[in-house]
From Swiss-Prot:
This is Phosphatidylglycerol--prolipoprotein diacylglyceryl transferase. The chain crosses the membrane at residues 10-30, 56-76, 92-112, 120-140, 172-192, 200-220, 234-254. Keywords: Cell inner membrane, Cell membrane, Membrane, Transferase, Transmembrane, Transmembrane helix. Its EC number is 2.5.1.145. It comes from Ectopseudomonas mendocina (strain ymp) (Pseudomonas mendocina).
Amino acid sequence: MLPYPQIDPVAIALGPLKIHWYGLMYLVGIGGAWWLASRRLARFDASWSKEKLSDLVFWVAMGVILGGRLGYVFFYDFAAYIAEPAKILRVWEGGMSFHGGLIGVMLATWWFGKRNGKSFFELMDFIAPLVPIGLGAGRIGNFINAELWGKATDVPWAMVFPTDPEQLARHPSQLYQFALEGVALFTILWFYSRKPRPTMAVSGMFAACYGVFRFIVEFVRVPDAQLGYLAWGWLTMGQILCLPMILGGIGLIAYAYKRQPVQGAA
């Protein structure tokens, strides 16, 4: 068993003002995505300025935050938030959904594309390789917060999390997700998007790979207490939400290569 590193979730405390590592991870993800996007901008559209790119990143970030919060409300704990709607605004208490954030990003991308003469999938293909930076940073934030841990296990790398009332050795599922959704997904999309691909293919690859990775990790991750398993003693809400991503991603890739020749890389 490995010892859990006791990291204070509060990174900086200035009197009553407390800045948490989880919030800083959002900044790392957004900043890293902007930096990488700026390096790829000329290949995407040489006429775009850094200011326009910053606008895109801003609206995508808003989509992540608003969509992530509302997605958690609707997908994971709807009854509790309907009973007390003011809880929706108490974001410091936790509760963000990747799938809600993805919907928020898609809406923000569609809106931004309409205003700037770009199709939805042109922008999504450009954005997709940037997303794993934020995903990886977010999972590190989950690990520091000692939340979203895995099932009890006797593997050599199991950890006892301080927030676990049972104090059992568990899978560090946050680190599994960091490795898969962050490192592996970034590597796949980075190399896949370096070569010319038809529009929609990069978006499809992102959706399919993320869906598969998340579906796998859900087998060792403890489901949200208020939901538990939804069917057959193992199916979680996360897995249900990943199924359309996997099927839709595969469908997008197949359709992309069928409908058009390869164009410039995103």
